[in-house]
């Protein structure tokens, strides 16, 4: 099995270095197959989870080599100057805390793990920025990702249905959830944990909606509704209910964005939304003609409880960990990596304790108050830039499809930022960080996409006039 994986890894690395057209697909392929291969190898070696980083790293080096190092920071300084100062301050804080971690814990790997978790999305922004020239390129990426995500959802559903395969079990002992007066199993499909599977399935649901709204050929609403039902059920079967909230909030933000920036919702849009809900109901009736079984009801009841528990969980996992972090390491943090995935391998995770469960607490325990300020300042600047991109996309000379894509990506990034505040550990996964960075890069590239779209439109008009 290791030999087969080595062959696939080598092929993906070669594609990343030689093919601009299929490079992102190679990254996605490696990201989705590294977990099932890990399950099938004796001992479940941990190195599998970073192999997607190898493929992505080669693509990043190729990108920087082709454009030059000076141009690699263009996504952050090309269009606005207010990103430069918070980004510079953030980098300075990271470097200080890296050396703090090195001298305090005496292990360079701890600091490198933490550094990678903060830097990876920004490296992916550079790759995403230079990987797309038009909306068609963005849609190709989404199509490949959604295809893999539907596969993950299908394997979760199969696992729930009773198919016991080695590739379907969770890595390690597996997670048991005590809820609804019983013990629920977290089904992970081909991914290594139910939480990882849930995030990718939720992301698939979000991108499927964006794909539909940016398509010039509207596919069957019944098909889309059926796929959404499958995805939402698969999320419920993982037991990771926060991802149901992610999809729900995404849908609300996306709808609000259309209403706010387009100033109105057409009758066709309202009718389509109503028809979509009706088709989803038909799909549920088709899949469960006799009603839900008790097993399904337990998972659905757990999933539904996320909405009533949301405010309490935000306080307990979003805000209180900041105070816990201060009590453990003080105002200036304990150094990079002590709250990151993998810290337990070096006996330092106990320093962070439960304070690293939420995103704000993780930043506080690793980077201290200066790092928390740096993150908030940087997120404000990035949000300001993304808002300017949305305003640009809402102009009459920009196609509605490009507007829909930018709104969708902005909503997707927003809900992930909110989820990070209460569940940071999932965002220590290399593949997830790469996906978030790539999507951010697509948004950062919007001015380029608009210019290219106008050029293509002008060229088409010129050709028609000549004809």
Where are these regions (language model features)?
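Alpha-helical transmembrane segments of multi-pass inner-membrane proteins
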Residues: 8-13, 95-98, 140-170, 179-182, ...
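N-terminal hydrophobic segments of proteins, predominantly signal-anchor/transmembrane helices
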Residues: 18-40, 49-119, 467
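Interfacial loop-to-transmembrane-helix boundary motif in multi-pass membrane proteins
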Residues: 29, 79-91, 119, 127-158, ...
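Transmembrane alpha-helices of multi-pass inner-membrane enzymes
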Residues: 60, 206-209, 247-252, 381, ...
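A membrane-periplasm/extracellular boundary helix in multi-pass inner-membrane enzymes
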Residues: 160-164, 238, 255-307, 323-328
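A conserved mid-to-late transmembrane alpha helix and its immediate loop/hinge
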Residues: 193, 240, 349-386
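Long extracytoplasmic/lumenal interhelical loops at the membrane interface
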Residues: 293, 298-367, 390-393
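Hydrophobic transmembrane alpha-helices and their immediate junctions
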Residues: 367-416
